[in-house]
A protein has these predicted regions:
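Cysteine-centered catalytic environments shared across enzyme families
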Residues: 1-247, 259, 263, 270
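Catalytic subdomain that performs nucleotidyl-dependent activation
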Residues: 251-258
């Protein structure tokens, strides 16, 4: 579409689409994008900074404004800490929502004055002022007359189409596989080069919380190599500080522990994984 409008691409990088898209559509660009993203474009002609975050908030985006009127932003809060103008103050108001919902539920983070750009929002920043708008929202008012079977078929088709779109890659692709329904379904649709699983041993030596056997069986059935590791309690306890460092804010979801080790395992073999 952009090429048809006369835009000439000089690279094969997908991010170049954002630059040409902004040239053509301005702040309407975010609503036209599909995928997971968080980006900023600085328009030197208008002195406007334009940014957006994907509709589900898959990609993080943090920002704050210093007393000097500077806008700091990044995909991690820790990337802002070294700036001399960053406000190093705890946001006590974030504690109650966190204890209630077990995650950082406010747009303002645990750092006073540092915010998350909400999912499905774009912003323009000029002359020290932030203007923000939502560009997408789900509509639950629509009632469907489809049968259960038709709904299931529609969902299956949508999932497979989405997985296929994400499957496009110039390098090997891996998949996290817990042995549960959702990861097994995605793995079967994706057919990655490798799968990755971690499990826990219980104090009595059992495998109550371990699904690596099911993950290995599915991988074998699909003809895919499965890399798996068993985690000890010592490994998990020793990693808590590092895990919290990477999370930036308090995180009560216990799945962040196996996910940390799962990412380490996968990174030794692939760079793109689901």
């Amino acid at each position: 579409e952009l090429q048809a409008k006369g835009h000439i691409f000089k690279t094969h990088c997908d991010t170049e689409v954002i630059l040409h898209g902004y040239e053509e559509y301005g702040n309407k660009l975010a609503a036209m994008l599909r995928g997971m993203f968080a980006f900023v474009v600085y328009d030197t002609k208008t002195n406007v900074m334009y940014g957006a975050r994907d509709i589900f908030g898959v990609k993080p985006f943090y920002y704050t404004q210093t007393d000097a009127g500077e806008l700091l932003f990044g995909s991690e809060i820790k990337s802002l800490l070294e700036h001399p103008g960053f406000r190093r103050e705890v946001n006590a108001e974030a504690l109650r929502p966190y204890l209630t919902f077990q995650y950082s539920a406010m747009n303002e983070t645990f750092f006073k004055g540092t915010y998350k750009l909400p999912p499905a929002h774009w912003f323009e920043y000029k002359d020290g002022k932030m203007h923000m708008e939502r560009y997408w929202d789900v509509d639950f008012r629509h009632k469907t007359g489809m049968s259960f079977e038709d709904c299931a078929a529609e969902i299956d088709a949508r999932v497979r189409e989405s997985v296929a779109a994400h499957r496009i890659s110039d390098v090997k692709v891996g998949s996290f596989l817990s042995g549960g329904v959702d990861s097994s379904y995605i793995t079967a649709c994706l057919m990655p080069d490798d799968t990755f699983s971690v499990g826990f041993e219980t104090p009595d030596g059992g495998h109550k919380f371990d699904e690596t056997t099911e993950a290995a069986e599915l991988s074998q059935k699909l003809g895919i190599h499965n890399y798996r590791e068993m985690l000890t309690k010592e490994q998990c306890l020793d990693a808590f500080a590092d895990i919290q460092y990477h999370m930036d804010e308090p995180q009560s979801n216990p799945s962040s522990v196996p996910l940390y080790f799962l990412c380490q395992l996968a990174r030794r073999h692939v760079t793109v994984f689901f």
